[in-house]
Amino acid sequence: MASQEKASMAGHMFDVVVIGGGISGLSAAKLLAEHETNVLVLEARDRVGGRTYTVRNKHVNYVDVGGAYVGPTQNRILRLSKELGLETYKVNVNERLVQYVKGKSYPFRGAFPPVWNPIAYLDYNNLWRTMDNMGKEIPADAPWEAPHAEEWDKMTMKDLIDKICWTKTARQFASLFVNINVTSEPHQVSALWFLWYVKQCGGTTRIFSITNGGQERKFVGGSGQVSERIMELLGDRVKLEHPVTYVDQSGDNIIVETLNHEHFECKYVISAIPPALTAKIHFKPELPSERNQLIQRLPMGAIIKCMMYYKEAFWKKKDYCGSMIIEDEEAPISITLDDSKPDGSLPAIMGFILARKADRLAKLHKEMRKKKICELYAKVLGSQEALQPVHYEEKNWCEEQYSGGCYTAYFPPGIMTQYGRVIRQPVGRIYFAGTETATRWSGYMEGAVEAGERAAREILNALGKVAEKDIWLQEPESKDVPAVEITHSFWERNLPSVGGLLKIIGFSTSITALWIVVYKFKLLTRS
């Protein structure tokens, strides 16, 4: 009662309070405001953007040290950003990419490095085909209802990789594929969850590709502008440095309290923060047991994002685009992309330190990380110019107390089938957004927009402003960034796996042996 009186006396009465000023929370608030709903956003940091963050200084002009990439089929973020007046540009892949493996560099073009060993090729082909086929069985909006959900959720991705792959090279690349896509280790994540994650991003090729894939484009001026421009539209309805510590929905209205003991009264709440961070909030009444158990079981991925700036794009002298896939346990960086500005100015290479490597290298001083990265680039690109950067930026997302890591929360084995179905189920008058609750491109900015707008429409439905059938809306394809259908050749669809080839050889050998025995028997009977 005392909290309610404080909130009312301060005039802090709203229809909806949104917890979290990232893209998901702000896209929810924007939609609510457009429907003449009195909304307030409470953000813990001194900035908006959440896991997107555009740093600006004289050395870089602007740089995305958090989420940055958009591409075809990510139609919601493309629509929203266009509405906000933002433009995209394509990440440079005009020159060749480089694969670094076993101490040697191999230039290539396309989404995946080529495989010349015929046995390894069969293994790689079967890996991608099997993962995509398994994903087709998993409903994007309810992975726990997949026919093999229980079986696959008991397995780690390491278990599945070991089961599918015959060759060491395929197993190692599959492990790297997990590291790159979800910033965690194959032994940490549920096979069901990872297969779902890849499926809802459009499959193995779409999620991993630059051209026609999830990394095709960036925003001119940085992705942080999405949140910043929504904040400009909302004005004083966004409050920074207001970490929420208490949510009381035991009375007629909900009381939300912040760390500085401000109180706000509302009818509904949207939680648009990573699931694990809701453990920082005290709830009255307590969260239901399944929800409480879920938020304790969804760790965040580990990543340090690193941008190395040079006087010139020296890698282009060798017809390299700046994108590298690095398979080396001692290498700090696992994958890179060109991070130069759209006009080619401020040449830079962006690299990810991922999963176990992020944990290991976080212990070093920043200058030592910089040195190790430069030495790696010199080796992979075959140029001493890599040792002479003019500037270095990095962001260790693991040390962010209001993110806990990046890109996204992951599901360890057994959690999806046991608790996953409550991920976006409302708790009383509290609704849940955040990219983790999305059904398309979860983990990306696209998923954040989907989740935020869906949560907003759920509340608009409760307020009688939106029909129930309009809570989940299909998004039209972007006309500016159309998707090209991903197709597979006859051989990619039909080549046997290594195991299948061995069975064919074994069967053929048996038939041949049987034919020889029969032939010799006939010769004997004739004589």
Curated annotation (Swiss-Prot):
The name under which this protein is listed is Amine oxidase [flavin-containing] A
As its record notes, the protein acts as a catalyst of: a secondary aliphatic amine + O2 + H2O = a primary amine + an aldehyde + H2O2; a primary methyl amine + O2 + H2O = an aldehyde + H2O2 + NH4(+); (R)-adrenaline + O2 + H2O = (R)-3,4-dihydroxymandelaldehyde + methylamine + H2O2; dopamine + O2 + H2O = 3,4-dihydroxyphenylacetaldehyde + H2O2 + NH4(+)
Disulfide bonds listed in the record: none
GO cellular component terms, alphabetically, are: mitochondrial outer membrane; mitochondrion
Signal peptide per UniProt:
none
- Reply yes or no: does the keyword Transmembrane apply: yes
Write out the topological domains of type Cytoplasmic.
Answer: 1-497
* Gene, per the UniProt record: MAOA
Upper taxonomic lineage: Eukaryota, Metazoa, Chordata, Craniata, Vertebrata
**InterPro entries, A to Z:** Amino_oxidase (IPR002937), FAD/NAD-bd_sf (IPR036188), Flavin_amine_oxidase (IPR001613), Flavin_MAO (IPR050703)
Quote the subunit structure annotation.
Answer: Monomer, homo- or heterodimer (containing two subunits of similar size). Each subunit contains a covalently bound flavin. Enzymatically active as monomer.
Family of the protein in this entry? Belongs to the flavin monoamine oxidase family.
Organism equals Equus caballus
Which example biological process does GO assign this protein? Answer: catecholamine metabolic process
